[in-house]
Amino acid sequence: MKITPIAFESLGVRSQATLIETKDLRVLVDPAISLAPRRYNLPPHQREVDRLTELAKVLVDVAKDVDVIIVSHYHYDHHDPGYVIPTDIYKNKLVFIKDPQNMINNSQKYRRAPRFLRSIKDKPSKIEIADGKTFEVGHTTISFSPAVPHGADERLGYVIQVAISDKDSTVIFTSDIEGAPKDVHLKFTKEKMPKTIIIDGPLSYLLGRVLKEEELEKSIRNMEEIVKNGLETVIIDHHVLRDINYAEVLKPVYDIAKDLGVRVTTAAEYLNLEPLILEARRKELFKEDNRPAKIPRGLANLLSAGEG
């Protein structure tokens, strides 16, 4: 099995787009890319826009040759109705989606999911609602958790976690569980016993606003439990990489992983690259170059459509 992170916060954008290849299947998970509309009360910097444009091209190119596309939920850094990533990537693909009607918040149920499904209408070879189901595709097994909360607050909606297995190994993509602040977030991982997990990490950059101290502490404890679950590799990237101090936040997890011989890494480091932290450094970027960014129309429309 080969795992290739395509776009993540450690690669300079908001995304969890990941390519997973088994012996007989190429699966693309959450093919979307976004930026924070505002951070430190600043709009995106030109370096962020350029990086998004660069990775969007890579993502579209990768999508041409995949067999399966998975959409774990309907936030704009996980799905795209055509703002930045053209919906033609779904042509002739088998598409697994989060249930657009059940265990879903109102903004996704009545606006985002319907718009997305209209945008890809008649393009996939087949669309399957995936929540809680298991599918055999060739010699590859793709399993989905029941819908679980998007972090500690169900008002943000629900996501489905994904386990992809061949005869050799299993990888879990947790989607936006925000570092597993609830015990229900752990159930799927404990059932599937993966060798590799891709997890987003807590919203520590919003501590004291959206995230409570006790929720952060529970996330870290539960991530420690995940590391103890027989894993070989843990890719922690997405929400927590929006915090410039992410390494300090995750130190307890790193420490336990080191003791157990588990590799804990960002998506960039998994690719043997230095993390390219842009959003968390936006103030610094504007101090270096204060010119307004030239934002393409599609990205401008995406940013105006709302965060998340």
Curated annotation (Swiss-Prot):
Family under the similarity heading: Belongs to the UPF0282 family.
Name of the protein described by the UniProt record: UPF0282 protein M164_2122
Lineage: Archaea, Thermoproteota, Thermoprotei, Sulfolobales, Sulfolobaceae
